[in-house]
């Protein structure tokens, strides 16, 4: 497992896909793109998807992703994307009350159970007290990162 901290965008594209019965169907797919701006995210998704889609496609939605860190797996069978919602717990020194600050992480895994295990593994290196509130499947099909 490795971690990538950056700015990410969720980008949805639409295109006509030929079905097995010969009919065309309008398909919407979601991807995550590492980019510095909406313009760069749109340019990157067009560059990445053009070789795989015959015909035209449209970028129909772009939004800043609700996470800024991705946990990437080295395992080839981990082909799905999950969002782990994690609450970090601290004590407010003035009021002496417990405070929770929630963060979301995009996790590459084969199952939600494995995504939970990966999240625990990646967070185990820190000293913070945390609670994993949820691990949810996402419609994200792939993630496009900057090449180093």
Task: Report residues per predicted region.
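A short, charged, amphipathic alpha-helix used as a generic interaction element across diverse proteins
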Residues: 37-53, 111-126
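Short, structured motif recognition centered on aromatic/hydrophobic residues
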Residues: 6-13, 29-32, 41, 45, ...
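Short aromatic-glycine-(Arg/Gly/Cys) micro-motifs in beta-strand/loop hairpins
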Residues: 2-26, 76-100
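Mixed-charge, glycine-accented linear interaction segment located at domain edges/termini
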Residues: 96, 104-144
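A cross-kingdom feature marking solvent-exposed beta-strand/loop segments within repeated
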Residues: 17-34, 51-54, 97-105, 125-132
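Short, mixed-charge low-complexity intrinsically disordered segments
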Residues: 50-91, 125-148
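A cross-family "folded-core" feature that marks the main globular domain of proteins
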Residues: 8, 14, 23, 44, ...
């Amino acid at each position: 497992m490795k971690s990538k901290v950056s700015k990410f965008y969720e980008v949805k594209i639409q295109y006509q896909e030929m079905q097995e019965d010969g009919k065309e169907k309008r398909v919407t797919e979601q991807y995550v793109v590492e980019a510095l701006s909406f313009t760069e995210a749109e340019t990157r998704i067009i560059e990445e998807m053009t070789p795989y889609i015959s015909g035209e496609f449209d970028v129909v939605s772009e939004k800043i992703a609700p996470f800024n860190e991705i946990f990437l797996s080295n395992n080839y069978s981990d082909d799905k994307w999950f969002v782990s919602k994690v609450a970090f717990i601290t004590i407010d020194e003035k009021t002496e009350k417990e405070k929770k600050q929630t963060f979301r992480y995009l996790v590459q895994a084969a199952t939600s159970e494995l995504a939970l295990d990966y999240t625990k593994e990646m967070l185990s290196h820190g000293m913070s007290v945390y609670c994993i509130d949820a691990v949810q499947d996402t419609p994200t099909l792939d993630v496009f990162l900057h090449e180093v």
